[in-house]
């Protein structure tokens, strides 16, 4: 079924499947919501797409501002899912599946949660001392980072990394240089008038060390 399918998928994705036999449309968004999915109802139809402008191209869809979403954006700099800036147009939350039946009934459900009740890693920590737990977690984090970076370096076009000088991007560069068989291209932005924000010196040291 669809749950078994999404459990095996890795990376960013958004897709729709039409089940001819069950007359059911299933829409899925990736775990952390990198790929967007928007939807609305208008003119007795269910309309969806990866961009809001695609939905607005349908003349039956009204163009009206969503006041609640605007308030959220002005307060928190984000319009939380399922809200969008347009009234009546919604976005499918990350890690969710939506099923739409032929009679118009629809339901969305979460298929992935970043904070499960008890994960496999939590089970592994049972009975370990603090030192042993730290050692296990550090090795597990490194292993997963290496796996994630290795998968994202599979590309048919040239790629690089944005290097800010912070711990996260520096770790990415370090692991990429270990995996790649070529020099890693790094890109950094510096500030001449905001010296407290400027990490150019740190980024340069990292780039020289690994390249």
Describe these PLM feature segments.
Residues 1-211:
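Cysteine-centered catalytic environments shared across enzyme families
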């Amino acid at each position: 079924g669809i749950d078994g399918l999404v459990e095996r998928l890795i990376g960013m994705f958004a897709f729709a499947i039409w089940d001819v036999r069950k007359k059911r449309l299933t829409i899925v968004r990736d775990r952390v919501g990198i790929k967007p999915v928007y939807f609305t109802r208008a003119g007795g139809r269910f309309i969806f797409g990866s961009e809001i402008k695609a939905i607005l191209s349908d003349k039956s869809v009204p163009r009206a501002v969503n006041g609640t979403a605007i308030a959220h954006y002005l307060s928190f700099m984000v319009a939380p899912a399922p809200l969008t800036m347009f009234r009546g147009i919604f976005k499918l939350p990350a890690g969710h599946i939506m099923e739409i039946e032929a009679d118009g009934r629809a339901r969305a459900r979460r298929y992935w949660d970043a904070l499960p009740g008890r994960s496999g890693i939590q089970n592994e920590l049972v009975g370990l001392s603090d030192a042993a737990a730290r050692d296990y977690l550090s090795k597990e984090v490194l292993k997963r980072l290496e796996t994630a970076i290795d998968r994202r370096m599979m590309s048919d076009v040239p790629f690089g990394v944005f290097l800010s000088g912070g711990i996260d991007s520096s770790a990415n560069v370090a692991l990429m240089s270990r995996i790649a068989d070529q020099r890693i291209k790094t890109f950094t932005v510096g500030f001449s008038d905001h010296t407290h924000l400027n990490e150019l010196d740190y980024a340069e040291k990292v780039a020289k060390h690994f390249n």
